[in-house]
Each structure stands twice: as C-alpha cells, then as structure tokens.
Amino acid sequence: MEEIFKNYPLLKNQNVPRETLIEFDLFISMLQEENEKINIISKETAKNEVIRERHIVDSAQIIEFVDLNSNIITDIGSGGGMPGIIISIMIKNQKNLAKVHLYEKSHHKSSFLRKVSRDLKLNTEVMQENIFEAEKLDSGTIMARAFKPLPIILDLVYKNFNSYKNLIVFMGKNGEKVLEETLMNWDFDFEKKKSITSEDSFLLNIKKIKKKN
C-alpha cells in the first residue's frame, strides 16, 4: 500500500482518493507552520500522527452528510479550517462546484484560511465576521465543530438563516445528556452516527429546527 494511504487508516473504507490525502498532508504542513506563530490548535494535537486523526479524519468523516448538490456549504466557526477546509479539499477532488463559506472573526485565523485556500486552489469564501451578527443567510449544509453548545448553535441557525438543508454538529462525551436536555426546548429531526475517531463522540445530522413554545 502506498505510504499516503497508510497515513490515514481510518479512511480506508471511505474511498478517499490519493489526491485528497496528499492535499490533507499539505494542509497539515501549513497548519503546523502557522501554529508556531499563533495558537490555532493545541501543541499536543499538532504532531503528525495525532493531527491526522484528531482533526483531519474527524472532520472528513462528515462528508456523507454534506449536501453536495448545494451551491453553498457553511462552516459557522471555522477556526483553523476544521471542518471547512477539509470538506472543501474533498469536494474539489470530487469535481464538485459548491463553495464553502468559512466564518471566522479572528484576523489571524482568517488570513491563514485565505492563504490555504489560495495555495490549494479551494473554492471558499472567508467571512471575517461574527456570524451571530450576520443576517438572512442561505446555505445548503451548515457545519459546526468545537464551536458553541448545541442550544446556541440551534438558536443561531433558527434566527440567522433564511434557508438551509441540514446542520451537522460534532458531539463530545457528554453529547447524549446535552441532546436530551436540548430536546426539552427544541424540536428537530436528527440522525446520529458514531464517530470513527472517538469512542465517546458522535455526529448529529439535524433538519427542520423548530423552537418549542
């Protein structure tokens, strides 16, 4: 097996092409270099063997929930580009024309996202603004990873988006409790999928968000 495939064993059943994995590694190099200047991810997770699983594969696993028929896919708190940059790399190599909107209010992180997008020729638009102040947004898939608690994310999508196809949220070890409590105040259709990178985590694919009276 070629070395690049050995670097991503958890993606071996996902049919991820070689070109995509190569660009993942290019992105990792850029992220590690920038991380020496500004704190984007923790130093512990910036090592090659850790970053691939903790950040790259963790982000890539949501691709099956991403609506690839959308014109716009939105990452509502992009940070260092996970999952937005990762999904943009994947859809580029699927010859998909969807644009990924990356919301990040930090000047330094936004500049990094623009540089990565230019260097990897990604179809993204970096929005250096606080998404909570944005209004009347439209999107296909919306993605939220390590951003805000679930109720705040739901409230943001409910109030600030005119239309959307689905919302993907990464849930951590207290996710089941958070979901149960959130459903007391919110109504939505959802599908759960166990994370391939963590025993304690799962993904939520959410549609039709409504507030309970």
UniProtKB/Swiss-Prot annotation:
Domain of life from the UniProt record: Bacteria
Family: Belongs to the methyltransferase superfamily. RNA methyltransferase RsmG family.
Protein source organism: Pelagibacter ubique (strain HTCC1062)
Gene that this polypeptide is encoded by: rsmG
Compartments where located: Cytoplasm
EC nos: 2.1.1.170
Molecular function (Gene Ontology), one example: rRNA (guanine-N7-)-methyltransferase activity
Gene Ontology CC terms, in alphabetical order: cytosol
Reaction(s) catalysed by this chain's protein: guanosine(527) in 16S rRNA + S-adenosyl-L-methionine = N(7)-methylguanosine(527) in 16S rRNA + S-adenosyl-L-homocysteine
Pfam families tied to this protein: GidB
InterPro entries: rRNA_ssu_MeTfrase_G (IPR003682), SAM-dependent_MTases_sf (IPR029063)
Entry protein name: Ribosomal RNA small subunit methyltransferase G
Keyword Heme (UniProt): no
Keyword Methyltransferase appears in the UniProt entry: yes
Biological role: Specifically methylates the N7 position of guanine in position 527 of 16S rRNA.
Assigned keywords, A-Z: Cytoplasm, Methyltransferase, rRNA processing, S-adenosyl-L-methionine, Transferase
